[in-house]
Amino acid sequence: MKVCIAEKPSVAREIADVLGATERKNGYIEGNGYQVTWTFGHLCTLKEPHDYAQEWKRWALSSLPMVPPRFGIKLISNPTYEQQFKVIESLMQNADMIINCGDAGQEGELIQRWVMQKAGAKCPVYRLWISSLTEEAIRDGFQQLKEQTEFNKLYEAGLSRAIGDWLLGMNATRLYTLRYLSLIHISEPTRRS
């Protein structure tokens, strides 16, 4: 079975229609040798600081900068996302081929790669690269599927951006909060006097 994973349910429906997959199941559409499923944008995210080191759970200047030895991903805690991920994981475990139908771009590549990694996808993966959801564009895209590896640099760029955002966001937020907001709270009563 070929498993197609789109970034949104509406895109999955468009793709399924063109492929002739019409049988609606829980979390996917099946037919004509395809199972078309979807994410809801991001299902996975980089782990939180405390997922790497327990001492990072407490906000302290002494723990900065926080730089994990290796970044990891986790499911976003949301019952709807978790349920859909279980569907995706099950489909991928039994797939002969996966077709990444994520949005054509850096973020679309990152979103789908993280889901496939988390699901432990082992079969060959191909990439549908289209910028339009017309029937003609979808048909042409499926005629010209590309090896997933052709998009490794795009994925790595998205991953680098996500890691950079994490490093700056997590560290700067804590530094600013601990260093400067504490000064505001201390000096506030003094200014009112």
Roles of regions detected by a PLM:
Residues M1-R179:
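Intrinsically disordered, low-complexity regulatory segments
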Residues I184-S193:
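Single conserved hydrophobic/aromatic residue that forms the stacking wall/gate
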